[in-house]
């Protein structure tokens, strides 16, 4: 078998406090995250937002030790996956490709070429597809592929989504079972799935399958778990004034407390490794909200990290992909046929249907409101502590 390069896609995270500002800048400079009517404003606005949010974000990272463990854990996952694939007689080398912090996608591509890789499998470390996560990373990889003849010649396969893979579901269920069994009354402990949210317009206007995959995944995990515990699915990490997927985690926690729920097992469903959203947002912020609402036993299921069952499921995904056809990254990033996602260089702005729909009317209104708020010094972003 030819030499296979496994590209593990992930978000990236600041490893030191001084990295927080540059990381945020890279994040908000991505047109997949914020699309502006005038492209020249992208970088200035990214600088402004990252500057305004740096102090608050730095405080959050200080509370978990001064930086994100995401790169360290992703590197461990890469090593474990590479080792297992080689045990299965697959001549594979893994490469970590972060979207917004080191090691960037360009580094992974350069390393693969230097190592003489002969074919590529792209594996997002996002179980559920979204245009803002896997989609953005696919597009970045495709951009590099189009500008690099040698890289473009390599046969490539990409795994778009794996939220329903039996091995992944089993790994999640096993970790949940341990926390449920540790409750005073395991049979009545309330299972609380918390997924990273996205703006509602992504789903309703652009046709992003993320919500559908999250909901299906939660049901499949509970079916795999084989228990009758009551459960809830909510969405966390909302920022800004626009409407995101609901119910919001903080509001759902308060509601469960009001209903008398005492034992809660929180499951970070869309996260495969520990990072700021699990260690700070769930473990600190949401724990406090739940406790104040009356929950007396707040237990959080650990992220998958290098769980053997999880790593084995990733290896299964790679082997299945290698046995299948090559994949075009543009097709891997595509949305349902009912909505056309235009190439970034052809996106238009305005009230017509040729605009990028999920960045259309809401974004236009949001951008106008943002400018007004910057000038006035008052508004919802100030109330939320974002400005």
UniProtKB/Swiss-Prot annotation:
Cellular compartments annotated: Cytoplasm
Domain of life of the native organism: Bacteria
Pfam families named among the record's database cross-references: Ferrochelatase
Q: Which residues form a coiled coil?
A: none
The protein's annotated pathway: Porphyrin-containing compound metabolism; protoheme biosynthesis; protoheme from protoporphyrin-IX: step 1/1
Binding, Fe cation: 196, 277
Q: Could you state a single Gene Ontology molecular function term?
A: metal ion binding
Top-tier EC class = lyase
- Which UniProt keyword terms apply here? Cytoplasm, Heme biosynthesis, Iron, Lyase, Metal-binding, Porphyrin biosynthesis
According to its UniProt record, the EC number is 4.98.1.1
UniProt keyword Glycoprotein present: no
Q: Which GO terms describe its cellular component?
A: cytoplasm
- State the reactions this protein catalyses: heme b + 2 H(+) = protoporphyrin IX + Fe(2+)
An example GO BP is: heme biosynthetic process
Q: Which InterPro entries match?
A: Ferrochelatase, Ferrochelatase_AS, Ferrochelatase_C, Ferrochelatase_N
Q: Which PANTHER family match?
A: FERROCHELATASE (PTHR11108), FERROCHELATASE, MITOCHONDRIAL (PTHR11108:SF1)
Q: What does this protein do?
A: Catalyzes the ferrous insertion into protoporphyrin IX.
**Membership in a protein family:** Belongs to the ferrochelatase family.
Question: What name is this protein filed under?
Answer: Ferrochelatase
Name its species.
Synechococcus sp. (strain RCC307)
